[in-house]
Amino acid sequence: MSLYRKRLKIVRGEGIYVWDSEGKRYLDLIAGIGVAILGHNHPKWVEEVGNQLNKLVVAGPMFEHEEKEEMLEELSRWVNFEYVYMGNSGTEAVEAALKFARLYTGRKEIIAMTNAFHGRTMGALSATWKSKYKKDFEPLVPGFKHIPFNDVEAAKEAITRTTAAVIFEPIQGESGIIPAKEEFVKTLRDLTEDVGALLIADEVQSGLRTGKFLAVEHYKVEPDIVTLGKGIGNGVPVSLTLTNFDVERGKHGSTFGGNPLACKAVAVTLRILRKERLVEKASEKFIKVKGKDVVTTRGRGLMIGIVLKKPVGRYVEELQNEGYLVHTSGQRVIRLLPPLIISKEKMMEVKSAIEGVINGDTEG
């Protein structure tokens, strides 16, 4: 399946660009759905991660290795969590978070949000909202319920002393790039603290992209658990679940999680982000698209949703024809998740290209 009628075969990448099998170059504003955060073939990243391939790829979770120490040192420059569990994908990070919440609290109930997307494994899928992802796999994990996103009163009614955790995305990625409201996030934090429940911020898509390392930092709220994935390894499959409490050894685990290659990829990615100040600079690159069919532009930094009055499929295809690869987030939202190395000037070019395609449409 593809967004595009003509499915591209991508054969190589360099920086913010990719090339197809016919030699055509495209400005990549999808980045593997937010994964290639340093762009493609970043020379320093390729050098260091390539060297790791020649040194040590796996060691087994029962051993320590210097790459893990290097990664933890780099991570500590960004966040202040005491414990890190490493997996291989965003949905694994969410599964770990849900299990840890039940272990820590001794409770079963998980509260998630309408229109949320947390992954496709059974626990994460139970926290996900849309029926199209879930219906063929029911019954799912019991104990999950959903409340309306950004509804303070619904949160007050739902969160009780039977609640193990509340999980939310600071910016909902799959349902239209919808930011959480400040009052809502602070209410979630206050309520969970009051009843002894945990607050889980799913930052798999929003992490690193919004001008701060974690999007939840914009709200000046500290969650109990954070999940990270996608761009954290710049293409190497890896995810992190961050907590400030320990979990009994053996209660959860992964064969590949925390392997030397993944740890090196995270360490190098974080070091480049830090030295080039790419996370902070993302806040300067947000664009607001204008046009006759544009309702609004949502998001923060380089997590952008352009909301239109009509389905976006034809615009996505036209942009591809002009050499711009964009994604969707629902039927009426163009989603941009470009590499953080993209310049402000290039984002202005993207703005002009999208406006040109939208405003050039004279059909109803």
Curated annotation (Swiss-Prot):
Enzyme superclass (EC): transferase
Signal peptide: none
GO cellular-component term (any): cytoplasm
Major location category of this protein: cytoplasm
Enzyme Commission identifier(s): 2.6.1.118, 2.6.1.124
Assembly and binders: Homodimer.
Reported function: Involved in both the arginine and lysine biosynthetic pathways.
Protein name as it appears in the record: Putative [LysW]-aminoadipate semialdehyde/glutamate semialdehyde transaminase
Species of origin: Pyrococcus abyssi (strain GE5 / Orsay)
Encoding gene, per UniProt annotation: lysJ
